[in-house]
UniProtKB/Swiss-Prot annotation:
InterPro entries named among the record's database cross-references: At2g23090-like (IPR039713), At2g23090-like_Znf (IPR039438), SERF-like_N (IPR007513), ZNF706/At2g23090_sf (IPR026939)
Gene3D superfamilies noted in UniProt: At2g23090-like
Disordered: annotated segments: 1-28
TM region positions: none
Pfam families (UniProt xref): SERF-like_N (PF04419), zf-met2 (PF12907)
Protein name: Uncharacterized protein At2g23090
Amino acid sequence: MGGGNAQKSAMARAKNLEKAKAAGKGSQLEANKKAMSIQCKVCMQTFICTTSEVKCREHAEAKHPKADVVACFPHLKK
């Protein structure tokens, strides 16, 4: 005889829990630290890798008005 719906649900839940434990090793905080790959060369503040050029320019103009944007973020030079 086959199992009932409750038994199937419990088995699926247990299986998914094991998958989540295996896939979720490590901390989200560690992943966030690794994603901080853009760094201002003047003040060494880090930015997430998806930060736009506009945000980098805003930072340079607000925090380092005397320094050139390229001095802060060398990857922005064309």
